[in-house]
Amino acid sequence: MTDPAPLTRALLSVSDKTGLIEFATDLSSRGVELLSTGGTAKALREAGLDVRDVSEVTGFPEMMDGRVKTLHPMIHGGLLALRDNDAHVAAMKEHGIGAIDLLVVNLYPFEATVAAGADYDTCIENIDIGGPAMIRAAAKNHGAVTVLTDSSQYAGLLSELDANANKGGGTSFQFRQRMAQAAYGRTAAYDAAVSSWMAGAAEIKTPPHRAFAGSLAQEMRYGENPHQKAAFYLDGSSRPGVATAQQHQGKALSYNNINDTDAAFELVSEFAPDDGPAVAIIKHANPSGVARGNSLAEAYKAAFDCDRTSAFGGIVALNQTLDAATAEEIVQIFTEVVIAPDADEDAKAIFAAKKNLRLLTTGGLPDPRAPMVAYKQVAGGLLVQDKDTGHVDPELLEVVTKRAPSAQELADLRFAWTVAKHTKSNAIIYAKGGATVGIGAGQMSRVDSSTIAALKAARMGTECGMADTPAKGSVVASDAFFPFADGLLAAAEAGATAVIQPGGSMRDADVIAAADEAGLAMVFTGMRHFRH
Protein backbone atom coordinates (compact mmCIF):
# COMPACT_ATOMS: atom_id res chain seq x y z
CA MET A 1 0.00 0.00 0.00
CA THR A 2 1.38 3.35 -1.06
CA ASP A 3 0.93 6.14 1.45
CA PRO A 4 -0.03 8.78 0.62
CA ALA A 5 -2.04 7.17 -2.18
CA PRO A 6 -1.90 9.06 -5.49
CA LEU A 7 -5.02 10.77 -6.80
CA THR A 8 -5.04 11.05 -10.57
CA ARG A 9 -8.54 9.93 -11.61
CA ALA A 10 -11.88 10.77 -10.01
CA LEU A 11 -15.47 9.72 -10.64
CA LEU A 12 -18.09 12.28 -9.61
CA SER A 13 -21.81 11.45 -9.56
CA VAL A 14 -23.91 13.55 -7.21
CA SER A 15 -27.55 14.45 -6.61
CA ASP A 16 -26.70 17.37 -4.32
CA LYS A 17 -24.47 19.65 -6.39
CA THR A 18 -23.61 22.03 -3.54
CA GLY A 19 -19.99 23.14 -3.98
CA LEU A 20 -19.49 20.73 -6.88
CA ILE A 21 -18.14 23.15 -9.48
CA GLU A 22 -15.59 24.78 -7.16
CA PHE A 23 -14.44 21.39 -5.92
CA ALA A 24 -14.14 19.83 -9.37
CA THR A 25 -12.34 22.93 -10.67
CA ASP A 26 -9.75 22.56 -7.92
CA LEU A 27 -9.28 18.87 -8.71
CA SER A 28 -8.89 19.62 -12.41
CA SER A 29 -6.27 22.28 -11.67
CA ARG A 30 -4.26 19.57 -9.89
CA GLY A 31 -4.29 17.42 -13.01
CA VAL A 32 -6.99 15.00 -11.85
CA GLU A 33 -8.96 13.38 -14.69
CA LEU A 34 -12.71 13.74 -14.18
CA LEU A 35 -15.25 11.01 -14.99
CA SER A 36 -18.93 11.64 -14.50
CA THR A 37 -22.53 10.66 -15.22
CA GLY A 38 -25.71 12.31 -16.46
CA GLY A 39 -26.61 15.58 -14.79
CA THR A 40 -23.31 15.83 -12.95
CA ALA A 41 -21.34 15.63 -16.20
CA LYS A 42 -23.65 18.22 -17.76
CA ALA A 43 -23.09 20.64 -14.87
CA LEU A 44 -19.32 20.20 -15.06
CA ARG A 45 -19.26 20.81 -18.82
CA GLU A 46 -21.41 23.89 -18.50
CA ALA A 47 -18.81 25.19 -16.04
CA GLY A 48 -16.15 24.73 -18.72
CA LEU A 49 -14.50 21.66 -17.22
CA ASP A 50 -13.11 18.78 -19.25
CA VAL A 51 -15.03 15.66 -18.23
CA ARG A 52 -15.33 12.15 -19.63
CA ASP A 53 -18.70 10.37 -19.59
CA VAL A 54 -18.89 7.05 -17.76
CA SER A 55 -20.75 5.65 -20.77
CA GLU A 56 -17.63 6.31 -22.84
CA VAL A 57 -15.55 4.33 -20.32
CA THR A 58 -17.97 1.38 -20.11
CA GLY A 59 -18.94 1.30 -23.77
CA PHE A 60 -22.59 1.17 -22.71
CA PRO A 61 -25.04 4.06 -22.73
CA GLU A 62 -27.01 5.02 -19.66
CA MET A 63 -30.23 3.03 -19.94
CA MET A 64 -33.57 2.22 -18.34
CA ASP A 65 -34.29 5.81 -17.35
CA GLY A 66 -30.91 6.10 -15.67
CA ARG A 67 -31.34 2.97 -13.55
CA VAL A 68 -28.22 1.47 -15.13
CA LYS A 69 -25.20 3.77 -15.44
CA THR A 70 -22.25 2.66 -13.36
CA LEU A 71 -22.99 -1.03 -12.69
CA HIS A 72 -20.17 -2.26 -14.91
CA PRO A 73 -16.78 -4.02 -14.47
CA MET A 74 -14.99 -1.04 -16.05
CA ILE A 75 -16.17 1.04 -13.08
CA HIS A 76 -16.18 -1.47 -10.24
CA GLY A 77 -12.91 -2.99 -11.39
CA GLY A 78 -11.34 0.46 -11.25
CA LEU A 79 -12.61 0.92 -7.70
CA LEU A 80 -11.94 -2.54 -6.28
CA ALA A 81 -8.62 -3.52 -7.85
CA LEU A 82 -5.75 -3.89 -5.38
CA ARG A 83 -2.94 -1.75 -6.76
CA ASP A 84 -0.22 -3.94 -5.21
CA ASN A 85 -1.73 -7.26 -6.35
CA ASP A 86 -0.01 -8.45 -9.54
CA ALA A 87 -3.01 -10.52 -10.64
CA HIS A 88 -5.35 -7.54 -10.22
CA VAL A 89 -2.97 -5.27 -12.11
CA ALA A 90 -2.70 -7.83 -14.91
CA ALA A 91 -6.49 -8.14 -15.13
CA MET A 92 -6.84 -4.37 -15.33
CA LYS A 93 -4.31 -4.25 -18.15
CA GLU A 94 -5.92 -7.15 -20.01
CA HIS A 95 -9.39 -5.61 -19.93
CA GLY A 96 -8.39 -1.98 -20.28
CA ILE A 97 -9.65 -1.00 -16.83
CA GLY A 98 -8.34 2.28 -15.48
CA ALA A 99 -7.89 2.79 -11.74
CA ILE A 100 -10.28 5.20 -10.03
CA ASP A 101 -8.56 6.89 -7.10
CA LEU A 102 -11.38 9.12 -5.88
CA LEU A 103 -15.12 8.47 -5.78
CA VAL A 104 -17.45 11.38 -5.06
CA VAL A 105 -21.06 10.23 -4.71
CA ASN A 106 -24.02 11.49 -2.75
CA LEU A 107 -27.16 9.46 -3.02
CA TYR A 108 -30.61 10.05 -4.46
CA PRO A 109 -32.56 12.08 -1.86
CA PHE A 110 -34.69 9.19 -0.66
CA GLU A 111 -35.16 10.47 2.89
CA ALA A 112 -36.20 13.94 1.69
CA THR A 113 -38.58 12.40 -0.84
CA VAL A 114 -40.32 10.37 1.87
CA ALA A 115 -40.42 13.36 4.23
CA ALA A 116 -42.11 15.40 1.50
CA GLY A 117 -44.95 12.87 1.39
CA ALA A 118 -44.24 11.56 -2.11
CA ASP A 119 -46.27 8.66 -3.48
CA TYR A 120 -45.04 5.07 -3.47
CA ASP A 121 -43.68 5.00 -7.04
CA THR A 122 -41.78 8.26 -6.58
CA CYS A 123 -40.18 6.94 -3.41
CA ILE A 124 -39.17 3.74 -5.20
CA GLU A 125 -37.52 5.72 -8.02
CA ASN A 126 -35.50 7.64 -5.42
CA ILE A 127 -33.89 4.48 -4.05
CA ASP A 128 -30.30 4.68 -5.28
CA ILE A 129 -28.70 1.45 -6.50
CA GLY A 130 -25.52 2.31 -8.37
CA GLY A 131 -24.45 4.92 -5.82
CA PRO A 132 -24.38 2.62 -2.77
CA ALA A 133 -22.71 -0.11 -4.82
CA MET A 134 -19.86 2.21 -5.82
CA ILE A 135 -19.56 3.69 -2.34
CA ARG A 136 -19.23 0.27 -0.75
CA ALA A 137 -16.68 -0.80 -3.35
CA ALA A 138 -14.54 2.30 -2.87
CA ALA A 139 -14.81 2.11 0.92
CA LYS A 140 -13.77 -1.54 0.93
CA ASN A 141 -10.68 -0.63 -1.09
CA HIS A 142 -9.77 2.37 1.07
CA GLY A 143 -6.21 1.11 1.09
CA ALA A 144 -5.98 2.90 -2.26
CA VAL A 145 -9.26 4.71 -2.93
CA THR A 146 -10.70 7.83 -1.31
CA VAL A 147 -14.50 8.07 -1.10
CA LEU A 148 -16.54 11.18 -0.34
CA THR A 149 -20.28 11.00 0.33
CA ASP A 150 -21.11 14.55 1.39
CA SER A 151 -20.22 18.02 0.13
CA SER A 152 -19.05 18.93 3.64
CA GLN A 153 -16.06 16.64 3.03
CA TYR A 154 -14.76 18.51 -0.03
CA ALA A 155 -12.72 21.07 1.88
CA GLY A 156 -11.15 18.35 4.01
CA LEU A 157 -9.94 16.47 0.95
CA LEU A 158 -8.42 19.57 -0.62
CA SER A 159 -6.63 20.36 2.65
CA GLU A 160 -5.36 16.78 2.73
CA LEU A 161 -3.96 17.13 -0.79
CA ASP A 162 -2.25 20.38 0.19
CA ALA A 163 -0.78 18.81 3.31
CA ASN A 164 0.75 16.01 1.24
CA ALA A 165 1.95 18.24 -1.60
CA ASN A 166 5.60 17.76 -0.66
CA LYS A 167 5.07 13.98 -0.86
CA GLY A 168 3.65 14.08 -4.36
CA GLY A 169 0.07 14.79 -3.30
CA GLY A 170 -2.56 12.19 -2.56
CA THR A 171 -4.27 11.10 0.63
CA SER A 172 -3.05 9.39 3.78
CA PHE A 173 -4.39 6.05 4.96
CA GLN A 174 -5.82 7.68 8.09
CA PHE A 175 -7.82 10.13 5.97
CA ARG A 176 -9.09 7.41 3.63
CA GLN A 177 -10.04 5.24 6.58
CA ARG A 178 -12.09 8.04 8.14
CA MET A 179 -13.85 8.66 4.84
CA ALA A 180 -14.52 4.93 4.41
CA GLN A 181 -16.11 4.74 7.84
CA ALA A 182 -18.29 7.73 7.02
CA ALA A 183 -19.21 6.09 3.71
CA TYR A 184 -20.32 2.84 5.32
CA GLY A 185 -22.23 4.85 7.90
CA ARG A 186 -24.02 6.70 5.11
CA THR A 187 -25.00 3.56 3.19
CA ALA A 188 -26.10 1.86 6.41
CA ALA A 189 -28.29 4.84 7.31
CA TYR A 190 -29.64 4.98 3.76
CA ASP A 191 -30.57 1.30 3.73
CA ALA A 192 -32.09 1.61 7.20
CA ALA A 193 -34.26 4.49 5.98
CA VAL A 194 -35.41 2.47 2.98
CA SER A 195 -36.11 -0.59 5.11
CA SER A 196 -38.06 1.43 7.68
CA TRP A 197 -40.14 3.16 5.01
CA MET A 198 -40.90 -0.12 3.27
CA ALA A 199 -41.92 -1.76 6.53
CA GLY A 200 -44.39 1.06 7.03
CA ALA A 201 -45.65 0.88 3.46
CA ALA A 202 -46.16 -2.88 3.78
CA GLU A 203 -47.67 -2.51 7.27
CA ILE A 204 -45.05 -4.80 8.79
CA LYS A 205 -45.08 -4.02 12.51
CA THR A 206 -42.21 -6.30 13.53
CA PRO A 207 -39.73 -6.65 10.65
CA PRO A 208 -37.12 -9.42 11.05
CA HIS A 209 -34.34 -6.82 11.06
CA ARG A 210 -34.44 -3.23 12.27
CA ALA A 211 -31.82 -0.49 12.13
CA PHE A 212 -31.75 3.13 13.27
CA ALA A 213 -30.81 5.66 10.60
CA GLY A 214 -29.35 8.87 11.98
CA SER A 215 -26.98 11.67 11.08
CA LEU A 216 -24.69 13.35 13.59
CA ALA A 217 -26.08 16.71 14.67
CA GLN A 218 -23.99 17.51 17.72
CA GLU A 219 -21.06 16.19 19.71
CA MET A 220 -21.64 17.06 23.34
CA ARG A 221 -19.24 17.93 26.13
CA TYR A 222 -20.62 14.97 28.04
CA GLY A 223 -23.73 12.87 28.52
CA GLU A 224 -26.08 12.40 31.43
CA ASN A 225 -23.02 12.72 33.71
CA PRO A 226 -19.61 14.31 33.09
CA HIS A 227 -17.81 10.96 32.77
CA GLN A 228 -20.09 9.84 29.91
CA LYS A 229 -19.44 10.70 26.26
CA ALA A 230 -22.49 11.72 24.24
CA ALA A 231 -23.74 12.89 20.87
CA PHE A 232 -27.08 13.80 19.28
CA TYR A 233 -28.22 12.17 16.04
CA LEU A 234 -31.14 13.20 13.82
CA ASP A 235 -33.41 10.65 12.18
CA GLY A 236 -34.60 12.97 9.41
CA SER A 237 -38.12 13.34 10.79
CA SER A 238 -39.82 16.69 10.22
CA ARG A 239 -41.87 16.39 13.44
CA PRO A 240 -41.76 19.74 15.29
CA GLY A 241 -39.68 19.42 18.41
CA VAL A 242 -36.24 19.82 19.92
CA ALA A 243 -34.52 18.03 17.01
CA THR A 244 -35.89 20.41 14.37
CA ALA A 245 -36.11 23.58 16.46
CA GLN A 246 -34.30 26.84 15.77
CA GLN A 247 -32.15 28.00 18.69
CA HIS A 248 -32.18 31.79 19.04
CA GLN A 249 -29.76 32.26 21.91
CA GLY A 250 -27.79 30.52 24.63
CA LYS A 251 -25.04 27.91 24.59
CA ALA A 252 -25.39 24.48 23.02
CA LEU A 253 -28.00 22.17 24.45
CA SER A 254 -26.70 19.44 26.74
CA TYR A 255 -27.74 15.78 26.74
CA ASN A 256 -30.06 16.39 29.70
CA ASN A 257 -31.40 19.61 28.12
CA ILE A 258 -32.44 17.74 24.99
CA ASN A 259 -34.03 14.89 26.92
CA ASP A 260 -35.99 17.19 29.21
CA THR A 261 -36.97 19.63 26.45
CA ASP A 262 -38.37 16.79 24.39
CA ALA A 263 -40.42 15.59 27.36
CA ALA A 264 -41.71 19.11 28.00
CA PHE A 265 -42.73 19.85 24.43
CA GLU A 266 -44.38 16.46 23.89
CA LEU A 267 -46.47 17.07 27.02
CA VAL A 268 -47.57 20.62 26.22
CA SER A 269 -48.40 19.59 22.65
CA GLU A 270 -51.27 17.51 24.05
CA PHE A 271 -53.09 20.82 24.52
CA ALA A 272 -54.26 22.28 21.21
CA PRO A 273 -53.51 26.02 20.86
CA ASP A 274 -57.10 26.69 19.79
CA ASP A 275 -58.27 25.34 23.16
CA GLY A 276 -56.27 27.98 25.00
CA PRO A 277 -52.78 28.61 26.38
CA ALA A 278 -50.93 25.84 28.20
CA VAL A 279 -47.53 25.66 29.89
CA ALA A 280 -45.48 22.72 31.17
CA ILE A 281 -42.42 23.00 33.42
CA ILE A 282 -40.19 19.92 33.40
CA LYS A 283 -37.39 18.72 35.64
CA HIS A 284 -35.57 15.40 35.08
CA ALA A 285 -38.15 14.46 32.41
CA ASN A 286 -41.02 14.79 34.92
CA PRO A 287 -43.47 17.69 35.15
CA SER A 288 -43.06 19.94 38.17
CA GLY A 289 -46.12 21.91 37.10
CA VAL A 290 -48.57 22.06 34.19
CA ALA A 291 -51.40 24.52 33.71
CA ARG A 292 -53.85 26.07 31.32
CA GLY A 293 -54.98 29.68 31.58
CA ASN A 294 -56.63 32.64 29.93
CA SER A 295 -53.16 33.80 28.87
CA LEU A 296 -49.74 32.19 28.64
CA ALA A 297 -48.52 34.35 31.51
CA GLU A 298 -51.40 33.17 33.68
CA ALA A 299 -50.77 29.54 32.73
CA TYR A 300 -47.05 29.91 33.47
CA LYS A 301 -47.69 31.38 36.92
CA ALA A 302 -50.09 28.56 37.76
CA ALA A 303 -47.61 25.91 36.58
CA PHE A 304 -44.81 27.61 38.52
CA ASP A 305 -46.89 27.80 41.71
CA CYS A 306 -47.43 24.04 41.69
CA ASP A 307 -43.79 23.47 42.71
CA ARG A 308 -41.76 26.66 42.93
CA THR A 309 -38.68 24.86 44.25
CA SER A 310 -38.47 22.29 41.45
CA ALA A 311 -39.15 24.87 38.73
CA PHE A 312 -35.72 26.42 39.35
CA GLY A 313 -33.39 25.33 36.54
CA GLY A 314 -36.24 23.66 34.69
CA ILE A 315 -37.47 23.50 31.12
CA VAL A 316 -40.50 25.57 30.10
CA ALA A 317 -42.67 24.50 27.16
CA LEU A 318 -45.51 26.58 25.70
CA ASN A 319 -48.24 25.63 23.24
CA GLN A 320 -48.56 29.15 21.80
CA THR A 321 -46.27 31.97 20.70
CA LEU A 322 -44.15 33.30 23.56
CA ASP A 323 -45.12 36.89 24.35
CA ALA A 324 -43.48 39.62 26.42
CA ALA A 325 -45.74 39.20 29.46
CA THR A 326 -44.86 35.52 29.73
CA ALA A 327 -41.18 36.18 29.07
CA GLU A 328 -41.14 38.67 31.96
CA GLU A 329 -42.52 36.00 34.29
CA ILE A 330 -40.07 33.33 33.12
CA VAL A 331 -36.94 35.44 33.66
CA GLN A 332 -37.78 35.94 37.33
CA ILE A 333 -35.96 32.65 38.06
CA PHE A 334 -33.18 30.67 36.42
CA THR A 335 -34.53 28.58 33.55
CA GLU A 336 -32.45 26.32 31.32
CA VAL A 337 -34.58 26.17 28.15
CA VAL A 338 -37.79 27.66 26.82
CA ILE A 339 -39.41 25.97 23.82
CA ALA A 340 -42.45 27.29 21.96
CA PRO A 341 -43.96 27.24 18.47
CA ASP A 342 -42.77 30.85 18.04
CA ALA A 343 -41.68 33.93 19.99
CA ASP A 344 -42.47 37.58 19.31
CA GLU A 345 -39.74 40.19 19.08
CA ASP A 346 -40.54 41.76 22.44
CA ALA A 347 -40.15 38.39 24.16
CA LYS A 348 -36.84 37.79 22.39
CA ALA A 349 -35.59 41.18 23.55
CA ILE A 350 -36.42 40.32 27.17
CA PHE A 351 -34.63 36.98 26.91
CA ALA A 352 -31.59 38.58 25.25
CA ALA A 353 -30.52 39.92 28.65
CA LYS A 354 -30.32 36.34 29.95
CA LYS A 355 -27.35 34.97 28.01
CA ASN A 356 -27.52 31.48 29.53
CA LEU A 357 -31.22 31.03 28.74
CA ARG A 358 -31.76 28.96 25.62
CA LEU A 359 -34.76 29.85 23.47
CA LEU A 360 -36.04 27.35 20.90
CA THR A 361 -38.87 27.81 18.40
CA THR A 362 -40.34 24.94 16.41
CA GLY A 363 -42.72 26.51 13.91
CA GLY A 364 -45.61 24.45 15.23
CA LEU A 365 -46.70 21.63 17.51
CA PRO A 366 -46.37 17.91 16.80
CA ASP A 367 -49.50 15.83 16.38
CA PRO A 368 -49.75 13.97 19.72
CA ARG A 369 -51.70 11.18 18.05
CA ALA A 370 -49.36 10.62 15.10
CA PRO A 371 -47.90 7.10 15.16
CA MET A 372 -44.25 6.86 16.17
CA VAL A 373 -41.85 4.15 17.29
CA ALA A 374 -40.16 4.25 20.69
CA TYR A 375 -36.86 2.49 21.41
CA LYS A 376 -35.21 1.43 24.66
CA GLN A 377 -31.81 -0.23 24.71
CA VAL A 378 -31.18 -3.14 27.05
CA ALA A 379 -28.08 -5.29 27.40
CA GLY A 380 -27.83 -7.28 24.19
CA GLY A 381 -30.93 -5.93 22.54
CA LEU A 382 -33.42 -3.22 21.75
CA LEU A 383 -37.00 -2.95 22.94
CA VAL A 384 -39.29 -1.48 20.28
CA GLN A 385 -42.87 -0.36 20.80
CA ASP A 386 -45.44 2.08 19.49
CA LYS A 387 -45.17 5.48 21.16
CA ASP A 388 -47.90 6.00 23.73
CA THR A 389 -50.35 8.11 21.73
CA GLY A 390 -53.38 6.78 23.59
CA HIS A 391 -56.21 9.12 24.51
CA VAL A 392 -59.67 8.62 25.94
CA ASP A 393 -62.65 10.57 24.64
CA PRO A 394 -65.11 11.76 27.33
CA GLU A 395 -67.90 9.54 26.06
CA LEU A 396 -65.71 6.46 26.61
CA LEU A 397 -65.11 7.16 30.28
CA GLU A 398 -66.94 4.75 32.58
CA VAL A 399 -68.46 6.21 35.73
CA VAL A 400 -68.13 3.42 38.31
CA THR A 401 -69.24 5.22 41.49
CA LYS A 402 -72.66 6.26 42.73
CA ARG A 403 -71.76 9.89 42.14
CA ALA A 404 -70.79 11.07 38.66
CA PRO A 405 -68.21 13.86 38.33
CA SER A 406 -69.45 17.39 37.73
CA ALA A 407 -68.60 19.19 34.49
CA GLN A 408 -65.70 21.01 36.19
CA GLU A 409 -64.45 17.82 37.81
CA LEU A 410 -64.61 16.03 34.47
CA ALA A 411 -62.58 18.78 32.77
CA ASP A 412 -59.96 18.61 35.51
CA LEU A 413 -59.91 14.80 35.41
CA ARG A 414 -59.16 14.83 31.69
CA PHE A 415 -56.45 17.44 32.24
CA ALA A 416 -54.86 15.46 35.09
CA TRP A 417 -55.04 12.24 33.06
CA THR A 418 -53.07 13.89 30.25
CA VAL A 419 -50.36 15.01 32.67
CA ALA A 420 -50.21 11.52 34.23
CA LYS A 421 -49.49 10.10 30.79
CA HIS A 422 -46.26 12.13 30.71
CA THR A 423 -45.15 11.43 34.30
CA LYS A 424 -42.86 8.59 35.39
CA SER A 425 -44.67 5.70 37.07
CA ASN A 426 -46.01 5.39 39.64
CA ALA A 427 -47.71 8.69 38.85
CA ILE A 428 -50.35 10.50 40.89
CA ILE A 429 -51.54 13.93 39.74
CA TYR A 430 -53.65 16.36 41.78
CA ALA A 431 -55.30 19.07 39.66
CA LYS A 432 -57.78 21.87 40.15
CA GLY A 433 -59.00 24.60 37.83
CA GLY A 434 -56.93 23.41 34.87
CA ALA A 435 -53.65 23.31 36.79
CA THR A 436 -51.65 20.73 38.68
CA VAL A 437 -51.48 21.33 42.42
CA GLY A 438 -49.49 18.26 43.45
CA ILE A 439 -47.43 15.70 41.52
CA GLY A 440 -46.13 12.38 42.83
CA ALA A 441 -43.80 10.70 40.35
CA GLY A 442 -41.50 7.72 40.02
CA GLN A 443 -42.23 6.00 43.31
CA MET A 444 -42.14 2.24 43.74
CA SER A 445 -45.56 2.19 45.40
CA ARG A 446 -48.68 4.04 44.30
CA VAL A 447 -49.59 5.00 47.85
CA ASP A 448 -46.20 6.71 48.26
CA SER A 449 -46.77 8.70 45.06
CA SER A 450 -50.19 9.70 46.37
CA THR A 451 -48.71 10.77 49.70
CA ILE A 452 -45.95 12.79 48.03
CA ALA A 453 -48.44 14.52 45.72
CA ALA A 454 -50.54 15.50 48.74
CA LEU A 455 -47.47 16.80 50.60
CA LYS A 456 -46.46 18.87 47.58
CA ALA A 457 -49.98 20.29 47.37
CA ALA A 458 -49.79 21.27 51.04
CA ARG A 459 -46.43 22.95 50.45
CA MET A 460 -47.89 24.81 47.48
CA GLY A 461 -50.63 26.14 49.73
CA THR A 462 -48.07 27.40 52.24
CA GLU A 463 -45.76 28.97 49.63
CA CYS A 464 -48.65 30.69 47.85
CA GLY A 465 -50.22 31.99 51.06
CA MET A 466 -53.40 29.96 50.71
CA ALA A 467 -55.71 29.40 53.66
CA ASP A 468 -55.68 25.65 53.04
CA THR A 469 -54.08 23.01 50.83
CA PRO A 470 -55.16 23.27 47.17
CA ALA A 471 -55.67 19.51 47.27
CA LYS A 472 -59.05 20.26 48.82
CA GLY A 473 -61.58 20.24 46.03
CA SER A 474 -59.04 18.84 43.58
CA VAL A 475 -59.23 15.75 41.37
CA VAL A 476 -56.71 12.93 41.16
CA ALA A 477 -55.34 10.96 38.20
CA SER A 478 -53.47 7.68 38.55
CA ASP A 479 -51.51 6.34 35.56
CA ALA A 480 -52.41 2.74 36.51
CA PHE A 481 -55.06 1.09 38.64
CA PHE A 482 -55.12 1.27 42.42
CA PRO A 483 -54.26 -2.28 43.53
CA PHE A 484 -55.65 -1.46 46.97
CA ALA A 485 -57.85 1.28 48.34
CA ASP A 486 -55.01 2.88 50.33
CA GLY A 487 -53.80 5.19 47.56
CA LEU A 488 -57.32 6.33 46.82
CA LEU A 489 -58.05 6.91 50.52
CA ALA A 490 -54.88 9.01 50.80
CA ALA A 491 -56.28 11.21 48.03
CA ALA A 492 -59.62 11.47 49.80
CA GLU A 493 -57.93 12.41 53.07
CA ALA A 494 -56.05 15.17 51.23
CA GLY A 495 -59.38 16.60 50.07
CA ALA A 496 -59.78 15.26 46.54
CA THR A 497 -63.33 14.89 45.25
CA ALA A 498 -62.93 12.84 42.06
CA VAL A 499 -60.57 10.23 40.64
CA ILE A 500 -59.62 9.00 37.18
CA GLN A 501 -57.78 5.71 36.74
CA PRO A 502 -57.63 2.82 34.26
CA GLY A 503 -59.39 0.22 36.41
CA GLY A 504 -58.70 -3.45 35.90
CA SER A 505 -57.51 -4.47 39.36
CA MET A 506 -58.66 -7.70 40.97
CA ARG A 507 -59.82 -5.47 43.83
CA ASP A 508 -61.70 -2.90 41.74
CA ALA A 509 -64.87 -3.64 43.71
CA ASP A 510 -63.12 -2.82 47.00
CA VAL A 511 -61.68 0.40 45.56
CA ILE A 512 -65.07 1.45 44.17
CA ALA A 513 -66.72 0.74 47.51
CA ALA A 514 -64.09 2.85 49.29
CA ALA A 515 -64.67 5.68 46.80
CA ASP A 516 -68.42 5.55 47.40
CA GLU A 517 -67.94 5.56 51.15
CA ALA A 518 -65.69 8.63 50.85
CA GLY A 519 -68.18 10.38 48.55
CA LEU A 520 -65.74 10.41 45.62
CA ALA A 521 -66.72 10.36 41.97
CA MET A 522 -64.55 7.94 40.00
CA VAL A 523 -64.21 7.13 36.31
CA PHE A 524 -62.34 4.32 34.59
CA THR A 525 -60.48 4.92 31.33
CA GLY A 526 -59.75 1.31 30.42
CA MET A 527 -56.28 2.48 29.36
CA ARG A 528 -53.03 2.48 31.32
CA HIS A 529 -50.18 4.98 30.94
CA PHE A 530 -47.11 3.35 32.50
CA ARG A 531 -43.96 5.37 31.79
CA HIS A 532 -40.50 4.10 32.67
Curated annotation (Swiss-Prot):
EC numbers, comma separated: 2.1.2.3, 3.5.4.10
UniProt xrefs under Gene3D superfamilies: 3.40.140.20, Methylglyoxal synthase-like domain
SUPFAM superfamilies per the UniProt record, alphabetical: Cytidine deaminase-like, Methylglyoxal synthase-like
Domain of life: Bacteria
Keywords, ordered alphabetically: Hydrolase, Multifunctional enzyme, Purine biosynthesis, Transferase
Entries under InterPro entries matching the protein: AICAR_Tfase_dup_dom_sf (IPR024051), Cytidine_deaminase-like (IPR016193), MGS-like_dom (IPR011607), MGS-like_dom_sf (IPR036914), PurH-like (IPR002695)
Entry's Gene Ontology molecular function annotations: IMP cyclohydrolase activity; phosphoribosylaminoimidazolecarboxamide formyltransferase activity
GO annotation terms (biological process): 'de novo' IMP biosynthetic process
Similarity field: Belongs to the PurH family.
Record's protein name: Bifunctional purine biosynthesis protein PurH
